[in-house]
Every structure is written in structure tokens, then in C-alpha cells.
Swiss-Prot record:
It comes from Esox lucius. The gene is epd. GO terms for biological process: cell-matrix adhesion. This is Ependymin. Binds calcium through the terminal sialic acids. The keyword Disulfide bond applies. EPDs are synthesized in the meninx and secreted in the cerebrospinal fluid. Belongs to the ependymin family.
């Protein structure tokens, strides 16, 4: 827990954040918020080695809790096929899709928690400015939240923008993994809703009962 707190604090300092408001213990703080529909780029880094685990485009449907992530071919360290995931959080299912070979696996998701939605149990910590103290137009006001995922025994720190609740980054840690998820080039709409349609070769598959969750999936890519 101590290592988690130190790492989370280091991330905030590296962002050059300036404290705007006091902690939740000294104020009521904002209410839990919900992400909008989003299209953007998600980058995943393993902090214990500095390795880029994955980077690619995603679409997120906040109403139906669906996520499609397609790894970018610019991720040059990949020796195998580029990852393509369809995650259905409400159903507790995700599909590992290989469009090139028209193959697919249907697997269970252990947890609904992920990096593009503030988890239900998140507790507000502080409100911050990211950017310049003097040039207000360059500032981004963010909320920092922390919490744990009981199903995975993991802990997280999430930064979301004030107002529209865009998740900018998520730090996630367990005894075995330490990951940083960075969200960029965000548009608050799903431009291609058809990406959530299941390819025909994925239909009718038997569900594989696994211990996968959003975070462990990206740790193993």
C-alpha cells in the first residue's frame, strides 16, 4: 500500500499539478461522475519496466458499457497479431478478435472495473490544476480519485476532468503488476457504433471461464 501511495504521488508531481482545493476530509468534494461516450487513443505502460504494453484506438459506449479497443500497427514491438478486443462489461464477457485469421475467443470478465469509467467505489481525494499557474487558458481542472477493486485485489488512482468527467489517466497496481493508462485525442461521441457489432465468426462460441479482467488483459498483451 505504501509503494502504491508513493507511486501515485509521483505521477501527480510529474504532471506539474498545483493544488486548487483541499482534500475530501476538509470539504464535501464532488459527487461521483460518469464518463461520456468516447472515441480516442489509449496507451498502456508498465511502470515497473517502462514498457509500452499497448497503444491503439478505442470506442466506449457509456450507456451500454461496451468497449472496443484495436491496437495500432505503430506499436512496433509486437511480434504477434495486433490485439482487437470487444469488452461487454454488463455481460461480464470479452472477445479476443483476430480479423486477419477470422478467429475469436469468448472469455469471462472477472470485474466491471476499467480505465475509461470511474469505478463505483472511487473516493474523491483532491481537485487540481494541470498546467500553468499564470496562463489560465492553458489550465485543465481535474479531480483525483482513489479506490480498490475487490475482485482483483488491485488499487487505483484516476484523474478525471472537472465538469465532463473525462478520464485522463489511471494508475493501477497489484502485488504483481503496475500499469499506467493514458487517454488522449478524445472525442465525446462514438463515431462508428458498428464497431460494437460482433463479427459473424465470433457468434455461437462457448464461454471460457477465466480470471481475466480489464487490467490483467492489458498486462499480458
Amino acid at each position: 500500500m505504501q509503494a502504491f501511495a508513493v507511486a501515485a504521488l509521483s505521477i501527480w508531481l510529474c504532471l506539474g499539478a498545483t493544488t486548487l482545493a483541499e482534500s475530501l476530509a476538509q470539504s464535501h468534494g464532488p459527487q461521483h461522475c460518469t464518463s461520456p461516450n468516447m472515441t480516442g487513443v489509449l496507451t498502456v505502460m508498465a511502470l515497473n519496466g517502462g514498457e509500452i504494453k499497448a497503444t491503439g484506438h478505442y470506442h466506449y459506449d457509456t450507456t451500454d458499457k461496451k468497449l472496443r479497443f484495436t491496437e495500432s500497427d505503430m506499436h512496433l514491438n509486437k511480434s504477434e497479431h495486433l490485439e482487437d478486443y470487444l469488452m461487454l462489461f454488463e455481460e461480464g464477457v470479452f472477445y479476443d478478435i483476430d480479423l486477419k485469421n477470422q478467429s475469436c475467443r469468448k472469455m469471462s470478465l472477472q470485474s466491471h472495473a476499467h480505465a475509461l469509467e470511474l469505478p463505483a467505489g472511487a473516493v474523491h481525494q483532491v481537485e487540481l490544476f494541470l498546467g500553468s499557474d499564470t496562463v489560465q487558458e492553458e489550465n485543465i481542472k481535474v479531480n483525483i480519485w482513489m479506490g480498490s477493486v475487490p475482485e482483483t485485489k488491485g488499487q487505483y488512482s484516476v484523474s478525471t476532468t472537472v465538469g465532463d468527467c473525462l478520464p485522463l489517466s489511471t494508475f493501477y497496481s497489484t502485488d504483481s503488476i503496475t500499469l499506467l493508462f493514458s487517454n488522449s485525442q478524445v472525442v465525446t461521441e462514438v463515431k462508428e457504433p458498428e464497431v460494437f457489432s460482433l463479427p459473424s465468426f465470433c457468434e455461437g462460441l462457448e464461454l471460457e471461464d477465466t480470471h481475466n479482467d480489464f487490467f490483467s488483459i492489458f498486462n499480458t498483451v
